Every structure is written in C-alpha cells, then in structure tokens.
C-alpha cells in the first residue's frame, strides 16, 4: 500500500444484525442473515463465507513467509521471492481447476534519496525529479547559472544563448513547459545539472521527467524561497543525488470462474508484491490469502449468476503498476463487462481498525481522495458496512486516495470498494474504545518494514476481514441488483485510461 490515507467515521445506513465469534469463525443463524441483494444471494454469500477459515488463510500466509525467508526476506517485484509468490498462487488456483493467466508487463522503477545543493559553504535540501540521473558520490560541480525569469524559463536551448551554460549548474524557475523539456534544453547547452525552483514555499515539489525520457543530467527541485536565495548568489555549486532507475518485467495473476455471465464480472483483487525491505505478510499477504482462499472455496465452476475474476497484482508497491497496466489494456467493452471491483489491501494489522472505502462520499470534501467515485460504489460500501455489523464491528471510512489498486478501476468508472485494517496512521483514543487495541500507536507499526511477518498478524482481524471478502464476492456473484447493487450494463459509464 502506498501514500497516506485519512479516515473518518462512516455514516451507517444499515440495521444491526446480531453475530458472535466462535474459534475465529463467525456464524449466523438463518434469522440473522442480512437480506441485501436478495435472500438467495445472501444464503449463498453466508455459505461461502463460512467455508473460508482463518486457519486456511494463515496457511497461505505461512507459505508466503516461507517464500520470503528463502529469498532474502522479501517478495518484492524483480526478486526471486516475487516469482515464487506468483508460482504459489498460480499452482494453488490450477490445483482448484482454474484456467490461469499470468500477463507480463514492463515497468521502470525510480529510487532516490534526498539530494543536496551546496553553494558558498551553505547546503540546502533538494528533491530528485522522478527518473533523474544520479551523481557520483562527490556530486557534480560547476558555476551556478540562472536562466532568465519569465513565463517560460529554460524551455528552449535559445533561452541560454548569451549565458555560459556549458559545464554549469543551471537554476531555472518552474514554468509552463514540461520538466523534461527544461532538462533537454539545459543538457543540449552542456549543463552538468539542473535545479528547478518551485513557485510555492511548501515541500520541494518532486515531479517527473517521464518514464520514457532519455534523461542526460541530474535534475532536482527546491522550494521557491530556496530558489530565490540561490538566484542571488554565484560561484561553484555542487549537486549531490543518489538515484537510479530499474527496468523490469513482472506478472499479474488472473483467474476467472468458468460459469456466470461474462458481461457482469465481479472482480476481486489484492497486490501480491511486498516492499523490498520486508516479507509483506500483512501488506499484502493478508489480502492475497483472503482472495486466494475465497477462490479455492468458490471453485472454478460454481452455480453463480455472474462470473468472478480473481486478480493478484504485481508492482503495487512501486506505484500500482500491475493493476494500472491491466486497466490500460482493456477497451470500453471489456471495461463495461466488469460490473464492480473489490480491493483488499492489508486485512490483518496487529492493532487493527475496520475500514471500508468511502463509496458514499460521506467524508468531508477536504478528506476525500477523489472528488467523485463511480456510481455503485456507495452500495458496495453499504454491503461491507452491513457485513462488519454482523461481525460485531462498526465501520469507519477510508478515502479513495489513490493508495491501492482500486485507483485504475475508479478512474475507469468501475464501481469499487473493499476492506482495510489500517497502516502507519495512529489509532485514536476513540477508535481504541470502539475496536480495542492501543491508542496513539499505528494500526500497523510494521508497515513497510522487515518486521511485517507472520508473527504480527492479527488472527481476529484476518478472520473477520477475510470472511468479508468471501461474503461480498458470494453476494455479488449471485445478484448485482437491489439497493446495494451496481448499474446494469446499459447504464454503465466507462473511461479509457491512457498509458503515461
């Protein structure tokens, strides 16, 4: 999971249904089962939910931990640990009778540490632009040359016609042209590095030069005030930056039931990769285990109205690359054929919360990740809120902030939702009172660390949230209608997602 999320209490619009926990499993009497999309669908959903056990999900997590242990403690894309994770999921699905696809995609991953600019004995912090070159350990040094300050500074080599740019470190203000154009103009005139001064005084802006740009020199950004200070000075200037770009190929894993309408596909996904720093057993082995066990228990040819497609994404931790690549590969008809997408990323945090994605947009405007989410997402949220009520948990919202693999689907207009147990954000006192756990501590103190191991999985959260995967999949596999349904084919609006 990437980026930070903001969480607020959800507006609950469902009746409380009595439930109880028994040895890590949740059981409901016939009378307490919720009628959401119809009684037959609810019966099927509860039956599927009851077949997805905590022990089975823990067994999948144990396998993923073993894979990480055998591969330098990681399952990150581009490592043998990721390849072994793909093989495990593929073999498990094939052993359950699924036809499995492993579409390959290419990506470039940029990594950088904070850079510095030194002039006249003073050092200031700078931020690499994505896909910048790095410098040698001692940096690159040259006289500081400032481009003219105008509406389009440094956008053309001619902007430097009367300036001694060759061998210099060039300072240019942010303007109307792309950063890659500024880099190219300075590089053509022989600059050894480029500093771009932002037009605001917040954090250094970052930005990208573009994955397909032939970058020739290091490029960093500084704030407006730092840029102003630099512009008033002269003399030898050194830029230091540790940065690299890695190109790789990776695979997603896709499997679909052989039964059910292919014009109304219910899609459930979880990212399969970890960060390089750790094994990723909560983030996101927990989501993988829940989706995988749901597939195993549903089977390859269930008696369902709508086909179910299971997805295990690669390179989420490097910017949602696998899922975004998949959505970009689909035409309008294929996008319309996906009735909804359910995303499961971090379900068993050790200090867990019980969050649903904010499909009804009940968060305050400034807390929403997207100004609008696709029609139908509110119904999905209500389904998960109702499920958590059954499990004895009161849901709170987490925003659609582009943090996980739902992002490409929502941008394409596909109704989306899911469950989430929290990451690096600290649990409030009110949340600790609501759910238990420790206030003022992160939901997952092991987030993106080597300590994200099997030993730190919360079994109760895994049992509740993992069962929620099966419940929602089973419900929508049988019925897409009702108050918590999604638009029918004729009413679906979809958008092509362009490749960068």
Swiss-Prot record:
It is an enzyme of class 3 (hydrolase). The active site is at 316 (proton acceptor). It holds the Pfam family PA. A lipid is attached at residue 25 (N-palmitoyl cysteine). Residues 140-231 form the PA domain. Residues 1-24 form the signal peptide. A lipid is attached at residue 25 (S-diacylglycerol cysteine). Binds 2 Zn(2+) ions per subunit. Keywords: Aminopeptidase, Cell membrane, Hydrolase, Lipoprotein, Membrane, Metal-binding, Palmitate, Protease, Signal, Zinc. An aminopeptidase; acts on free N-terminal amino groups with a very strong preference for Leu in the first position. This is Probable lipoprotein aminopeptidase LpqL. The lineage of its organism: Bacteria, Bacillati, Actinomycetota, Actinomycetes, Mycobacteriales.
